[in-house]
Regions:
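Alpha-helical transmembrane cores and adjacent cytosolic helix/loop segments
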Residues: 1-220
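Peripheral (non-transmembrane) domains and long loops of multi-pass membrane proteins
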Residues: 1-17, 74, 79-82, 198-294
């Protein structure tokens, strides 16, 4: 995804991490109360999920702060891969929580409990959780639109999943109140599957970043289109792209008329570079000029 320009994308990313941690802390406190009053395994599932979300969000906060540091003499390409490392750490937290939930859900299916007390409080807490999560996801989506941050996308993935999870728990609480006791652990099983899917998505994207995976074909096509539409360019080859944090790196060979002077060729290459910088919010471009005979 190509992010749109914003006057201060770094500040947006920091605010997104602060908002994520604050929201997770608020949800944990409210869910502890709801679980204590209802003894619902579904609410316990969301409590564990929110607790791990907070740990992951704290990891994100630290990683984003490090990733936004400027390049130095020992890290010439910046610190952007700290985001991918954070994503790998998050996936471990998430996969672990899925295992805990599976065990708890199976135990509750073997030993079901009667209708729980405090259902009204539990419902109120889960509805509040959905509203708070919707606000956070909306803000994270805005930040991603302007930064395309992998760490923020991973965090948003948690909370988008939580919206489905919280909705399922609300249904489970209502049905359990009417003595459909098996529905509560069934929802917990479904939640664990959602969590595992989320972990896989984060792992896949993190590995792509760490292994310098090429940008998607759609973005590579847009890059080539920008290059070829620039006046006096004859073509390009050996296009290589990668992403590190919120930085994009592009390098390619630019084919130019062999009769051009060095100054003219350099001026054309500069024009291509500026066009690419207007397409991406954070990009570093390396161009090798190749002479071709017309």
């Amino acid at each position: 995804m190509i992010s749109t320009q914003h006057p201060n994308p770094d500040r947006l990313m920091r605010w997104a991490t602060y908002a994520s941690v604050a929201t997770a802390m608020l949800l944990i406190l409210t869910k502890i109360i709801a679980w204590f009053l209802t003894d619902s395994v579904s609410i316990m599932a969301t409590l564990i999920d929110s607790s791990l979300d907070m740990l992951a969000s704290i990891v994100n906060l630290v990683a984003v702060s490090h990733a936004l540091q400027p390049a130095d003499s020992e890290h010439r390409f910046g610190h952007g891969k700290a985001e991918a490392l954070a994503g790998m750490g998050q996936s471990m937290f998430i996969a672990g929580s899925a295992g805990i939930l599976l065990l708890q859900a199976v135990e509750r299916m073997i030993n079901p409990k009667e209708a729980m007390a405090g259902i009204d409080v539990g419902l109120g807490v889960m509805i509040f959780s959905m509203l708070a999560t919707m606000l956070l996801v909306g803000f994270q989506s805005y930040v991603i639109k302007h930064t395309d941050s992998t760490a923020i996308k991973a965090d948003r993935l948690h909370y988008k999943t939580d919206l489905w999870v919280n909705g399922s728990v609300i249904i489970a609480l209502i049905l359990t109140f009417y003595n459909f006791s098996y529905f509560d652990p069934i929802v917990a099983l479904g939640i664990s599957i959602f969590i595992l899917v989320s972990a896989w998505e984060i792992i896949r994207e993190s590995i792509d970043l760490l292994m310098d995976h090429e940008l998607p074909d759609e973005e590579r096509k847009k890059i080539k289109k920008v290059i070829l539409k620039t006046p006096r360019t004859q073509g390009c080859h050996d296009l290589r792209t990668r992403r590190s944090g919120n930085m994009i790196f592009i390098q390619f060979h630019l084919e130019l008329d062999a009769t051009l002077s060095l100054l003219e060729a350099h001026s054309i290459a500069d024009g291509v570079e500026q066009e690419l910088k207007s397409l991406f919010s954070n990009v570093e471009v390396i161009i090798h000029e190749d002479p071709v005979t017309l």
